[in-house]
Amino acid sequence: MNKIKPGRKIPGRVDPCRIVARLKNSGTLVNLAGNYDYLSSGYYLSQDRENSGHIIRPTCKEMLDAYVPPLFLEKARLAGILVPEYYISNGYFESPVIVDPINPFTLKGRVILKSGKARTIAKSLTRNYTYAICCQEIPACGKIKYFRSVLGWSVSPKYRELSNIVWEVFDIPLARVRVICTANGECLLSDISPLFIEDLGVREIRYVQEHVSWDN
């Protein structure tokens, strides 16, 4: 996928500083910060607009639903989206598994395919067994894949339907989406993480330009 490199000029390139736009189809404000983690600048941006009485996507509540692993998985499941089997633990898990921290001090999860270092990893991710972790079971022959979701669209046709679901269910405009692809061809929605405007490829930027407008 082509990315815009520093110094390369693209006609009509999106300015990463202009992160609040309006959806052309509805006029609703959209937060294009890319990182919607709790207490991030993107979180405060939506909070300020909400406190001013504006409707903006995503809301602070929607950010929490999307960025807290068990909330994300349960919301997806209730919406009829395929997700992996998962459980919450304070240290114990069986491989192969994806382990995501729930605590606000540890952001990066781990993929554990063998049980050799499971105890050490569990101790680290739980901050010495203080915080819980969300454990997603990896099915036999399952493969972990990633795609980028931009306003419900993906460069890859394979993931466009799932990208649209992420947008419609979670209201997250920009996201790096993790899925587990099973042996029978199913894609299990697993996680979403930040994706910034400045990291978008040329086709992704053009898609943004086609679907949003700026007030100035």
Q: Positions of the model-derived regions?
A:
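C-terminal active-site "lid" helix and adjoining low-complexity regulatory extension at the edge
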Residues: 171-172, 181-216
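A short glycine-rich, hydrophobically flanked beta-strand micro-motif that places a catalytic Asp/Glu
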Residues: 132-138, 144, 172-184
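A conserved acidic, glycine/proline-rich C-terminal tail/linker
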Residues: 161-170, 174-176
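Active-site nucleotide/adenylate-binding loops and adjacent lid/helix of ATP-dependent enzymes
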Residues: 1-164, 209-216
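Active-site flanking residues adjacent to catalytic metal/cofactor-binding acidic residues
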Residues: 99, 177-179, 190
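Hydrophobic residues on conserved beta-strands that form the core of alpha/beta folds
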Residues: 83, 174-176, 189
